[in-house]
Amino acid sequence: MTTQEIIEVIKGLSVLELNDLVKACEEEFGVSAAAGVVVAAAGAGAAAAEEKTEFDVELTEAGDQKVKVIKVVREITGLGLKEAKDVVDGAPKVVKEQASKEEAEEIKKKLEEVGAKVTLK
């Protein structure tokens, strides 16, 4: 199997399947994917004085119109129905990581229009 074929297979995986793949790779090779995140977080401290350009969009509360919120979460994330429902039921959950300011504001607006409470971090 070529590198390109592996990439194509990975592109077809859901978020939950990707999470399982990362965990399996960590166990198989005795590494941690979190190590890179720690390094990135250390560098982010210096950039904190500058204006923040990337945001995590957190679904804080689903509100009364849960079905509509699930539909919007599916639209934003590309998740299947069950995965999107799990995200909404498990609120507070991050629905989009490292979104640009404009994208984060747009996602927040869409979710708030259907009654959800959203926090940008």
UniProtKB/Swiss-Prot annotation:
Gene3D superfamilies noted in UniProt: 3.30.1390.10, Single helix bin
Key words of the record: Ribonucleoprotein, Ribosomal protein
Secretion signal, residue range per the UniProt entry: none
Any one GO biological process: translation
A GO CC term assigned to this protein in UniProt: cytosolic large ribosomal subunit
Subunit structure as annotated in this protein's UniProt entry: Homodimer. Part of the ribosomal stalk of the 50S ribosomal subunit. Forms a multimeric L10(L12)X complex, where L10 forms an elongated spine to which 2 to 4 L12 dimers bind in a sequential fashion. Binds GTP-bound translation factors.
Family the UniProt entry places it in: Belongs to the bacterial ribosomal protein bL12 family.
Known role: Forms part of the ribosomal stalk which helps the ribosome interact with GTP-bound translation factors. Is thus essential for accurate translation.
Name of the protein in its database record: Large ribosomal subunit protein bL12
